[in-house]
């Protein structure tokens, strides 16, 4: 949690290997995460199967010609059988209630629909952890309420959620542990009740 510009998104990009630390190290499964390790196809595949990143701007992660192709892209890249790809795709489409969007082009969807598709894309790979950058940004109240409930359901199902937000209510609703980044980049950790 923190205000705009304090480094929340940069921290999440570091955690997901989209940018690299200039100093210090951090690890995944005992291995240092850096440009070299993520160029190793075996390590990169293992990492991205276990950690899913959902961008603040869903347009950044949507690129296929229709929603079904978009959601099936990740499982195909994992080398799963077409039968398993279809099962996972159908399962997350049903879970997120987006069957009516299956054949639609992602760039023609509303902001809330795009966010649901972006989440479906990541969930189709069944990662252990979801990293979400400002998940409520740009969503109407109804979609925000739905998304908070959905994230709580994922948390109850055992998913690890790492969420950046400047929304106090969301932070306190979702967090077991809250890391607050100040404007001066000072970090404070708070354990929620």
Located regions from the model:
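Conserved ABC transporter NBD signature motif
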Residues: 24-36, 47
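Hydrophobic anchor residue at the start of the ABC signature
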Residues: 119
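Conserved ABC ATPase signature
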Residues: 105-109, 113
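H-loop/switch region of ABC-family ATPase nucleotide-binding domains
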Residues: 165-166
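Catalytic Walker B motif of ABC-type/P-loop ATPase nucleotide-binding domains
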Residues: 130-133
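Conserved ABC ATPase "signature" region
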Residues: 83-101
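Helix-to-loop junction immediately C-terminal to a conserved catalytic motif
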Residues: 16
